[in-house]
């Protein structure tokens, strides 16, 4: 399963435009190839959570724009959904918004001898993400974060 960052970067501002019109936050945009087929996945959210109508309205509007702008040369399937309970964290604002929640962060390079941190998000300080991973606070620059998401233990 490979991702195509170039297409994602072209689609992101189009998705944010639609999100702004519908009062929805664009959480993530993924363009992937799975089992020989391409999928454009757009994850949306709002404070009270999204429902099927939100996803349908967003899908209809973004579909028209994607047809007009045509940023994707090959055929693909469009999927619009909620990010789920283990939503990805992409922007500094995400880490601030979900301070106090449990999260998992993977970094590109080792920080304090490790590349994976799981613990309580403490927010943002001096432009860096702060997490308490059980051994005290760790500050992680956003550009060093390879992947981050909320975690939920059942």
Swiss-Prot record:
Compartments reported by the entry: Cytoplasm
Keywords for this protein: Cytoplasm, Ribosome biogenesis
GO CC annotation: cytosol
GO terms of biological process kind: ribosomal small subunit assembly; translation
UniProt-listed Gene3D superfamilies: Ribosome maturation factor RimP, C-terminal domain, RimP-like superfamily, N-terminal
Family matches, as InterPro entries: Ribosome_maturation_RimP, RimP_C, RimP_C_sf, RimP_N, RimP_N_sf
Principal location class: cytoplasm
SUPFAM superfamilies: YhbC-like, C-terminal domain (SSF74942), YhbC-like, N-terminal domain (SSF75420)
Cell division keyword on record: no
HAMAP family named among the record's database cross-references: RimP
Family that this chain belongs to: Belongs to the RimP family.
Function: Required for maturation of 30S ribosomal subunits.
Name by which UniProt lists this protein: Ribosome maturation factor RimP
Species name: Carboxydothermus hydrogenoformans (strain ATCC BAA-161 / DSM 6008 / Z-2901)
Highest classification ranks of the organism: Bacteria, Bacillati, Bacillota, Clostridia, Thermoanaerobacterales
């Amino acid at each position: 399963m490979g991702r195509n960052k170039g297409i994602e970067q072209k689609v992101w501002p189009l998705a944010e435009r639609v999100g702004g019109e519908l009062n929805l936050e664009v959480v993530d945009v993924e363009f992937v190839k799975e089992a020989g087929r391409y999928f454009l996945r757009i994850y949306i959210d709002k404070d009270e959570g999204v429902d099927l109508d939100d996803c349908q309205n967003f899908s209809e509007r973004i579909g028209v724009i994607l047809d007009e702008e045509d940023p994707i040369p090959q055929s693909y399937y469009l999927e619009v959904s909620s990010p789920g309970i283990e939503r990805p964290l992409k922007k500094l604002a995400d880490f601030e918004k979900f301070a106090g929640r449990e999260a998992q962060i993977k970094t590109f390079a080792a920080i304090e001898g490790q590349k994976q941190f799981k613990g309580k998000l403490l927010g943002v300080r001096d432009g860096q993400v702060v997490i308490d991973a059980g051994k005290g606070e760790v500050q992680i620059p956003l550009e060093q974060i390879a992947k981050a998401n909320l975690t939920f233990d059942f």
